[in-house]
């Protein structure tokens, strides 16, 4: 069986996540590189257009240059699969699992891959006493790193040096 040649490429970039600027920059770099190699390239920004409009375009493959929420968490990938168009990136489940820090940690632990100690906080049960108990039970010492469970890159990452700063920064994360 002959391999299909992907000549018409759609670069999906931008989006509405907190990483929009990074996605636009990397997406534009991909467009330049692909055009330089002789590919026909179109761009698509889902912040301004519905994914279903992709079906109207004459493309062979989607180059996913989205970052963060909806771009790396399985959402865009599920749209691409529903449109039955090949795309770059991991599949829906792999993307979802990799983007979610808690699921990733569980997979790493199950496979005996060492990672730092951690605990997760949910908005519904957040309170200073719960945080103190978790820190004591998990034997976690300061400083600690906090990060939203579903953000990419360094968005929301804070290094906190004491309980007061942990409470303050966690409240900010939950807003």
Can you say where each PLM-predicted feature lies in the sequence?
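Short Gly/Pro-enriched turn/cap motifs at secondary-structure boundaries
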Residues: 69, 148-149
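Short, basic/glycine-rich phosphate-binding loops at helix/coil junctions
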Residues: 112-115, 149
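ATP-binding N-terminal substructure of ATP-dependent carboxylate-amine bond-forming enzymes
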Residues: 1-93, 97-99, 103, 110, ...
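Conserved ATP-binding module of the ATP-grasp superfamily
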Residues: 115, 139, 143, 158-175
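Acidic/histidine-enriched active-site and ligand-binding environments that engage anionic O-linkages
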Residues: 132-146
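Conserved S-adenosyl-L-methionine
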Residues: 118-120
């Amino acid at each position: 069986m002959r391999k299909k040649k992907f000549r018409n490429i759609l670069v999906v970039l931008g989006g509405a996540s907190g990483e929009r600027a990074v996605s636009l920059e990397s997406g534009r770099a991909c467009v330049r590189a692909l055009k330089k190699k002789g590919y026909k390239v179109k761009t698509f920004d889902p912040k301004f257009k519905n994914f279903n409009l992709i079906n109207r375009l004459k493309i062979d493959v989607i180059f996913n240059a989205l970052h963060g929420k909806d771009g790396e968490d399985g959402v865009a990938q599920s749209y691409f699969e529903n449109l039955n168009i090949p795309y770059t990136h991991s599949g829906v489940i792999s993307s979802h699992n990799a983007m979610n820090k808690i699921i990733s940690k569980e997979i790493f632990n199950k496979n005996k891959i060492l990672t730092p100690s951690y605990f997760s906080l949910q908005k519904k049960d957040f309170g200073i006493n719960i945080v103190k108990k978790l820190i004591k039970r998990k034997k976690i010492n300061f400083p600690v790193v906090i990060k939203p469970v579903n953000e990419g890159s360094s968005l929301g990452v804070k290094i906190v040096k004491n309980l007061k700063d942990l409470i303050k920064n966690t409240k900010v994360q939950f807003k």
